[in-house]
Amino acid sequence: MTESLDGIKERALREIASARDTETLQSVSVKYLGRKGAVTLFLRNLSQLPAEERPRAGQAANQVKQDLQAALDRATEQIAADSAAVDGIDVSLPGRPVSRGTLHPITRITRRICEIFGRMGFDVVEGPEIETDYYNFEALNIPKHHPARDMQDTFYISDNVVLRTHTSPTQPRVMEKTAPPLRIIAPGKVYRCDSDVTHTPMFHQVEGLMVDRNVSFGDLKGILTLFIHRMFDPETSLRFRPSYFPFTEPSAEVDIRCVACRGKGCRICSHTGWLEILGAGMVHPAVFEKAGYDTQAYTGFAFGMGVERIAMLKYNIDDTRKFFENDTRFLRQF
């Protein structure tokens, strides 16, 4: 009878494990533990055993009964938990869309600048952000004791190493390794000791350089005019003003008609109707000489612009610091 009891337990546990609802479990309980169940009948038949075997068989039967009841209780709880989890899902509720990131406005503008000049034959190059004094200043005709070298304008790492103050150092680096003709633009981060509504200690620039035979200021004006019309609007008015940069001669500032007031005068343009957008000029012969270029055979022009400045005008943003605050309410607009 003991072997028969083991068989009863094995069959009952299999049926409990395969049950998928409480009704099935109730049937299993009646089948094995009910008044006419297999375990109950086994206990009733103990009188047929020899007297010396009855205690051991009775103890085994009661243990099987307890084991089966415990298995039934666990299965009932699991089925109830599974049912509650399913019932807790309201399939009629609208789904939650996955939140997707977008390109930062500075990245958008930088890529757009590279795209426009890329269509005009300019290659994109990059340079180190930690730069030597020579490439950041000397190679660009910025001599010792020039105001741009002052501590209030430049982050010095050591006496001869700085965080680059512009992306212009890329130009002499490329010219030393590349014979003309060449057309390059150099986007990247730059650093200056400055922080206010329109300036941050770290910002982004794009420098451009074109060198070839017979390159003129007229070529510079034509390329920059085309760039501005493609970046903003074909009807955008612009003007070139005389200026000074150590690495270009002659030099110019380029202004566009104020995008906010359309030239009528407002707070953004200081009531002049114009907004400065970039600086440019013909490459100074001293820069060519340091790079090993023949100043009698080649001429060229260079230009530089602040990406934040372009983005502020493009998107009508009044504070450059918004680009660096990581406010998703602001960034989600782009």
UniProtKB/Swiss-Prot annotation:
Binding site for Mg(2+): 249
SUPFAM superfamilies per the UniProt record, alphabetical: Class II aaRS and biotin synthetases, tRNA-binding arm
Cofactor binding notes: Binds 2 magnesium ions per tetramer.
PROSITE patterns found in the cross-reference section: AA_TRNA_LIGASE_II
CDD domains referenced in this protein's UniProt entry, alphabetically: PheRS_alpha_core
E.C. number(s) listed in UniProt: 6.1.1.20
InterPro entries, A to Z: aa-tRNA-synth_II, aa-tRNA-synth_II/BPL/LPL, Phe-tRNA-synth_IIc_asu, Phe-tRNA_ligase_II_N, Phe_tRNA_ligase_alpha1_bac, Phenylalanyl-tRNA_Synthase, tRNA-bd_arm
GO cellular component: cytoplasm
Cofactors that this protein relies on: Mg(2+)
GO biological processes: phenylalanyl-tRNA aminoacylation
Catalysed reactions, semicolon-separated: tRNA(Phe) + L-phenylalanine + ATP = L-phenylalanyl-tRNA(Phe) + AMP + diphosphate + H(+)
Keywords, comma-separated and alphabetical: Aminoacyl-tRNA synthetase, ATP-binding, Cytoplasm, Ligase, Magnesium, Metal-binding, Nucleotide-binding, Protein biosynthesis
Recorded GO MF terms: ATP binding; magnesium ion binding; phenylalanine-tRNA ligase activity; tRNA binding
Location of this chain's protein in the cell: Cytoplasm
Quaternary structure note: Tetramer of two alpha and two beta subunits.
Record-stated family: Belongs to the class-II aminoacyl-tRNA synthetase family. Phe-tRNA synthetase alpha subunit type 1 subfamily.
HAMAP family: Phe_tRNA_synth_alpha1 (MF_00281)
Protein name according to UniProt: Phenylalanine--tRNA ligase alpha subunit
